[in-house]
UniProtKB/Swiss-Prot annotation:
Its EC number is 2.3.1.274. It comes from Brucella ovis (strain ATCC 25840 / 63/290 / NCTC 10512). The lineage of its organism: Bacteria, Pseudomonadati, Pseudomonadota, Alphaproteobacteria, Hyphomicrobiales. It comes from the Bacteria. The gene is plsX. SUPFAM superfamilies: Isocitrate/Isopropylmalate dehydrogenase-like (SSF53659). The keyword Cytoplasm applies. It is an enzyme of class 2 (transferase). This is Phosphate acyltransferase. Homodimer. Probably interacts with PlsY. GO terms for cellular component: cytoplasm.
Length: 346
């Protein structure tokens, strides 16, 4: 049995999306048990619509719901100990839950997670890792917005953690890892990127295969299993990809409705277009993982629908089932030991 705590008030639609999404996840994974946190007047009526889910879940009342526009410092002051977001995270800390899922305010969720759960040993900064659809299937990209800027050591930690996540989700024994850069040549890029690349070259690991620098157009190609960057660049890349996907979908819709012949062609190609739409649907790959914390926290997109929230829950489920935290902690310890040994010999 896997226990997942849910911030039922998170996201643009709160319980109206969160609870149906959890119900979908429960249908697919009957061994999940949920603990919902939220305002009783809003959560209980929605939960009552799903009797099977309600029977297999627990509801705990909260006093405060964190707003999507609240500043992290404001959210910490107002919500510590009594908000649905804080209580869902705290359930992981106390062992009541194995993972937490929230569609709430990203900054507040990260601040509360760091304050409540603390960081893994030897990890200086957390990263948000996202699943990215590619021509080869899916890749992991991190950091997509946890922090602005990262030094060489932090980028290397992201590489090790991202590779651990890839092994857990994709069942790849030795994921390929690339550092996002302005070119693939070794002389290009910022000093911290070049230094991180040198560290990864000098410290071979069983758990990942370093493939060098990759460019922005390599992300969608699926050139590597894990793309590593700092949060400022990663978030811009994410938002650009989301905007491009929406633009392409709209341009395609316009082209297919422009003439009678185009409309007829659309009818015959409907199956192919439906498969393309499903491939590009952000709800299918929803769920950013906060890596580097001493507990599992999953961030769902605030505007996700029920299917999207279900996807985020499933990411958390897979993380727990595959013992992600233990594996990442072991990988980091092994890497830091190996790197210190290589450095001392140098």
């Amino acid at each position: 049995m896997i226990k997942i705590s849910i911030d039922a008030m998170g996201g643009d639609f709160g319980p109206e999306v969160v609870i149906p999404g959890a119900a979908k996840a429960f249908e697919r994974h009957p061994d999940i048990r949920f603990i919902f946190f939220g305002l009783p007047a809003q959560v209980e009526p929605v939960l009552a619509r799903y009797p099977k889910l309600k029977e297999a879940s627990e509801f705990r009342a909260s006093e405060v719901a964190i707003g999507m526009d609240d500043k992290p410092s404001q959210a910490l002051r107002a919500g510590r100990g009594k908000s649905s977001m804080w209580q869902a995270i705290e359930a992981v800390k106390t062992g009541d839950a194995d993972a937490c899922v929230s569609a709430g305010n990203t900054g507040a969720l990260m601040a509360m997670s760091k304050f409540c759960l603390r960081m893994m040993s030897d990890v200086e900064r957390p990263a948000i890792a996202g699943i990215w659809p590619t021509l080869r299937g899916e890749s992991i990209v991190l950091d997509i917005g946890a922090t602005i800027g990262a030094d060489a050591r932090q980028l290397v930690d992201y590489a090790v953690m991202g590779a651990g996540m890839a092994r857990a989700l994709f069942e790849v024994r030795k994921p390929t890892v690339g550092l996002l850069n302005v070119g693939t040549e070794e002389v290009k890029g910022l000093d911290e990127i070049k230094e991180a690349g040198q560290i990864l070259c000098d410290t071979p690991l069983d758990g990942l295969e370093y493939s060098g620098f990759v460019e922005g157009n390599d992300i969608g190609k699926g050139t590597v299993d894990v793309v590593v960057t700092e949060g400022f660049t990663g978030n811009i890349a994410l938002k650009t990809a989301e905007g491009t996907a929406r633009q392409m979908a709209e341009l395609l819709r316009q082209a297919m409705s422009r003439t009678l012949l185009a409309k007829i062609g659309h009818v015959f190609a409907k199956g192919a277009f439906d498969r393309l739409r499903e491939k590009m649907d952000p709800n299918k790959v929803n769920g950013g993982v906060f890596l580097g914390l001493s507990g599992i926290v999953i961030k769902s997109h605030g505007g996700a629908n029920a299917e999207g929230f279900c996807s985020a829950v499933e990411v958390g489920y897979d993380m727990v089932r595959n013992r992600l935290l233990e594996k990442i902690e072991a990988d980091l310890a092994h890497f830091h030991h190996s790197h210190s040994h290589v450095s001392s010999k140098a």
